[in-house]
Amino acid sequence: MQPPGPQQPPPPPLFTPNNGDFTFVSSADAEDPSGSITTPDVKLNLGGEFIKESSATTFLRQRGYGWLLEVEDDDPEDNKPLLEELDIDLKDIYYKIRCVLMPMPSLGFNRQVVRDNPDFWGPLAVVLFFSMISLYGQFKVVSWIITIWIFGSLTIFLLARVLGGEVAYGQVLGVIGYSLLPLIVIAPVLLVVGSFEVVSTLIKLFGVFWAAYSAASLLVGEEFKTKKPLLIYPIFLLYIYFLSLYTGV
């Protein structure tokens, strides 16, 4: 029986146990590195409602890219209706039309709203409508009537200020424009009775007096005192000229 041979020394370790500040662990003694990372639940409070963020959202916010997730709130000013954007109040325009067509104080309308709260679109619509029924195949009448409305109102405004009236040009422009409504009302009547000269003339005079009274009762206040005829007369002449543009005289 042969004696056992010399035993071979064990192989050197793969890692040195201690190397300065680091400790190396052999692969045989290492723990299984598999596992999972729990993502904290992050909730946003948006308008009283809590919304759970995803891991991608959380990652972007932690890296300073949260601005990519921001959503702009709609500005209520950008969602206004078109009429409101253009400052068009149909109820207000309708009320002013009734005030002009029924100028008698006994009817109970607050007629001063036509002067104290002027608007542009209502008078412009009235003037354009009057221009359309006054065409007679000539589109230049439209621009001419608008020109007379603008500069005629300017003349009345300057005269009112010279006489001591406290009135703005926008107020005069609105009152003169709205007061064209009586001439629009008598237009279809003139088509019917146009062959009767006397009746037609009376209706024309009635329409002019109606329009001039509606405008003068709003523009000529108590501040004019004895100077009222000086302002009523040019208003009356202005509506005579408007009527002449319609009749073609």
Swiss-Prot record:
List all Polar residues biased stretches.
Answer: 16-26
List residues traversing the bilayer: 117-137, 139-159, 172-192, 201-221, 229-249
Q: How does it sit in the membrane?
A: Multi-pass membrane protein
Q: Where is the composition biased (Pro residues)?
A: 1-15
Topological domains annotated Cytoplasmic: 1-116, 160-171, 222-228
Q: Is the Transmembrane keyword given for this protein?
A: yes
Q: Which UniProt keywords apply?
A: Golgi apparatus, Membrane, Transmembrane, Transmembrane helix
Q: Which InterPro entries match?
A: Yip1/4-like (IPR045231), Yip1_dom (IPR006977)
An annotated GO BP: vesicle fusion with Golgi apparatus
Domain of life of the organism encoding this protein = Eukaryota
What is the role of this chain?
A: Involved in the maintenance of the Golgi structure.
| Stated name of the protein | Protein YIPF4
